Amino acid sequence: MKSFKEQYTLDERLAESREIIAKYPTRIPVIAEKYCKTDLPAIEKKKFLVPRDMSVGQFIYILSARLHLSPGKALFVFVNNTLPQTAALMDSVYESYKDDDGFVYMCYSSEKTFG
């Protein structure tokens, strides 16, 4: 399965993120994709529009539900190979790690280490 960046050109992604932010200024565009070396399933919809004041932990909970993970199954998200604190707000993650195309890219895994 192609990554979001492989599916769309930079101009297409930039236009989409600008449109999203203009239409929903209190939300941020997030792309969540499976880490290639994890045994977790691929998520059907990669794009998320999350409230700026949502915590990373709340976002992980939503991802777990979308992936239909069993209650004890661990799920970790990485942004630029970094494990953000679960208490961090998505807005601060976005401002620190947003891509040139206006999206923030998160990679999910069942392992706490990346690489």
From Swiss-Prot:
Any Gene Ontology CC annotation: cytoplasmic vesicle
Tissue spec. comment: Constitutively expressed.
Subcellular location: Cytoplasmic vesicle, Autophagosome membrane; Vacuole membrane; Cytoplasm, Cytoskeleton
Matches recorded under SUPFAM superfamilies: Ubiquitin-like
UniProt xrefs under InterPro entries: Atg8-like, Ubiquitin-like_domsf
PTM summary: Gly-115 forms then a thioester bond with the 'Cys-558' of ATG7 (E1-like activating enzyme) before being transferred to the 'Cys-258' of ATG3 (the specific E2 conjugating enzyme), in order to be finally amidated with phosphatidylethanolamine. This lipid modification anchors ATG8 to autophagosomes.
Alphabetized UniProt keyword annotations: Autophagy, Cytoplasm, Cytoplasmic vesicle, Cytoskeleton, Lipoprotein, Membrane, Microtubule, Protein transport, Transport, Ubl conjugation pathway, Vacuole
Single GO MF annotation: protein-phosphatidylethanolamide deconjugating activity
Transmembrane segment boundaries: none
Alphabetized CDD domains for the sequence: Ubl_ATG8_like (cd16108)
One Gene Ontology biological process: autophagy
Lipidation (Phosphatidylethanolamine amidated glycine): G115
Gene3D superfamilies in the cross-refs: Phosphatidylinositol 3-kinase Catalytic Subunit, Chain A, domain 1
Membrane topology of this protein: Lipid-anchor
Entry superkingdom: Eukaryota
Subunit description: Interacts with ATG4. Interacts with NBR1.
Family: Belongs to the ATG8 family.
Job of this protein: Ubiquitin-like modifier involved in autophagosomes formation. May mediate the delivery of the autophagosomes to the vacuole via the microtubule cytoskeleton.
Identification of the protein by name: Autophagy-related protein 8i
Native source organism of the sequence: Arabidopsis thaliana (Mouse-ear cress)
